Amino acid sequence: MVDKREEVMHVAMFPWLAMGHLLPFLRLSKLLAQKGHKISFISTPRNIERLPKLQSNLASSITFVSFPLPPISGLPPSSESSMDVPYNKQQSLKAAFDLLQPPLKEFLRRSSPDWIIYDYASHWLPSIAAELGISKAFFSLFNAATLCFMGPSSSLIEEIRSTPEDFTVVPPWVPFKSNIVFRYHEVTRYVEKTEEDVTGVSDSVRFGYSIDESDAVFVRSCPEFEPEWFGLLKDLYRKPVFPIGFLPPVIEDDDAVDTTWVRIKKWLDKQRLNSVVYVSLGTEASLRHEEVTELALGLEKSETPFFWVLRNEPKIPDGFKTRVKGRGMVHVGWVPQVKILSHESVGGFLTHCGWNSVVEGLGFGKVPIFFPVLNEQGLNTRLLHGKGLGVEVSRDERDGSFDSDSVADSIRLVMIDDAGEEIRAKAKVMKDLFGNMDENIRYVDELVRFMRSKGSSSSS
């Protein structure tokens, strides 16, 4: 009889169609594969092509399973990721995603994995897994504080909060003092997203069923960082909740020459140690023209070196590039963010505060400057700011407007002013927590022990 502690598991991974979800799922896949387990990573053709190439020692352990995304009305051709469609088309992408149920069910029936680890959008998956006798875990890319703010699965399914004001106060199930709430201008976007759209199912309901019908919940964080929130989360969910650590960023060797990185590195190499502010607001957010203008003028006024990444070509102020030439670099399109954040000349990170970016930035000890734009980013900002980690750009509470002075002041505080010394020191301390690979591996080891003890009886 094979010892359960030595048994090789077959684990299927099914992330939502966004790079900010695909990459952490792949990171966890690699860590499980390094422990000797077999992984089936399921997504669409274009998303799989976008993923970084596997190291040769993992190629035999991770199999990419590709399902074409069914075409639907309202979704532009070749749109397979949230980065391919505007914000107001996200629900159309989910409608196409929901049509993957038949091929996914057939694959699971044929391959009989021991576990399937899934994302929030596939609320229909747990019932399929249960029918096939496959153990199922919801992998949350949100931290424990955000999950607690969202509440127990029943509150999500019943959608008990519906107005912006409902989201700007601490919910009744949080029994201790908390600053984890949305600002009004943040929540107006969030509440819009909870409404039913072309799929007939809101994001709130998707989350609720994904949590409620799971056998366990895996969380990309750890109790050392948010102890009170993990304790509350276990009370709210009443099922196994496992921290998996931060899945810290790793710079992998790549034989291919990355011409984009070569050009960026050449510029960064010329800058002083910890002098550069890296500016990136994610792949999904689209800033209005006036916001781009104020952000640009704020970077100019800060008199600090900066590297600014934009997803598409915006209209920046006339003469801006000329005035900041040599001190600032503007790049349109994809960049190797982990490599940039690892560079010694980068000291600060003006970020939308998506959890992936938070982990990557603090994993290298970079000081965050918060500019939340969408989704749970405001909650992440409150969590970090409450711990003295970083500075938030001042904005109008109602409409989210800001001016160039608030941008410049935030940058100078983090990068130059004596008053920011404590903030800079705390970010460096966080590097030992967010970037500690050994400590994070310990959480993955505990996760594997649990999965082995609870997995299905299907063959590997």
Curated annotation (Swiss-Prot):
The keyword Transcription regulation does not apply. Keywords: Glycosyltransferase, Transferase. The gene is UGT91C1. The keyword Transferase applies. Its EC number is 2.4.1.-. This is UDP-glycosyltransferase 91C1. SUPFAM superfamilies: UDP-Glycosyltransferase/glycogen phosphorylase (SSF53756). CDD domains: GT1_Gtf-like (cd03784). It comes from Arabidopsis thaliana (Mouse-ear cress).
